[in-house]
Amino acid sequence: MSVVPPNRSQTGWPRGVNQFGNKYIQQTKPLTLERTINLYPLTNYTFGTKEPLYEKDSSVAARFQRMREEFDKIGMRRTVEGVLIVHEHRLPHVLLLQLGTTFFKLPGGELNPGEDEVEGLKRLMTEILGRQDGVLQDWVIDDCIGNWWRPNFEPPQYPYIPAHITKPKEHKKLFLVQLQEKALFAVPKNYKLVAAPLFELYDNAPGYGPIISSLPQLLSRFNFIYN
């Protein structure tokens, strides 16, 4: 190892150890914090049924027509969806609503104008999965795990706003909903609530669409505790 003599000029290369001064600050805390989420077995949860819950629009074309009309009146649509996770044999599973044989979606929906995102998601979760006996469900919502934008009145959505888009037509936010140790869910009769393992969702946009199939990556930052 070479050593710079004490009388040598410090203008050449390599320079002394003080070249960068305080440019690089010593990190006193880790750059990332470990976020721990408790998961409970699917068998801890009870699933009942309630009256059917129908979509506002009868077709995809009708949905985009209503979106266009509302955009002219109130601007961009805001949508929130909840990601509920359980485990089976220490493998994380996401609860999905299944309509028919091939359509899956996360519980959630449209926010009212000016409605708070978290409070709106709690309202929607109660409407979709809330129990019928009047006991209020305690939805714990702390983490936003994803943002998706719809640039036009068309099906494609992206996890970013395309560069040429100044007025997205819809903004969808995904939130992790932490479940209690035990709970009762009432599922609308026209839906099935299914538990899909992460390995089934991963890289499976043809089966579940781009948003649901991205959940394994979005959830990988959490440290799951299997109770």
UniProtKB/Swiss-Prot annotation:
Primary residence: nucleus
Localization of this protein: Nucleus; Cytoplasm
Sequence positions bearing N6-acetyllysine: K23, K29, K56
Keywords: Acetylation, Cytoplasm, Differentiation, Methylation, mRNA processing, Nucleus, Phosphoprotein, RNA-binding
GO cellular component, one term: mRNA cleavage factor complex
Induction: Up-regulated during spermatogenesis.
One BP term from GO: protein heterotetramerization
Region entry Interaction with RNA, spans: 102-104
Residues annotated with N-acetylserine modification: S2
Subunit structure: Homodimer (via N- and C-terminus); binds RNA as homodimer. Component of the cleavage factor Im (CFIm) complex which is a heterotetramer composed of two subunits of NUDT21/CPSF5 and two subunits of CPSF6 or CPSF7 or a heterodimer of CPSF6 and CPSF7. The cleavage factor Im (CFIm) complex associates with the CPSF and CSTF complexes to promote the assembly of the core mRNA 3'-processing machinery. Interacts with CPSF6 (via the RRM domain); this interaction is direct and enhances binding to RNA. Interacts with CPSF7. Interacts with FIP1L1; this interaction occurs in a RNA sequence-specific manner.
Function: Component of the cleavage factor Im (CFIm) complex that functions as an activator of the pre-mRNA 3'-end cleavage and polyadenylation processing required for the maturation of pre-mRNA into functional mRNAs. CFIm contributes to the recruitment of multiprotein complexes on specific sequences on the pre-mRNA 3'-end, so called cleavage and polyadenylation signals (pA signals). Most pre-mRNAs contain multiple pA signals, resulting in alternative cleavage and polyadenylation (APA) producing mRNAs with variable 3'-end formation.
Family: Belongs to the Nudix hydrolase family. CPSF5 subfamily.
Protein's name in the database: Cleavage and polyadenylation specificity factor subunit 5
Organism of origin: Mus musculus
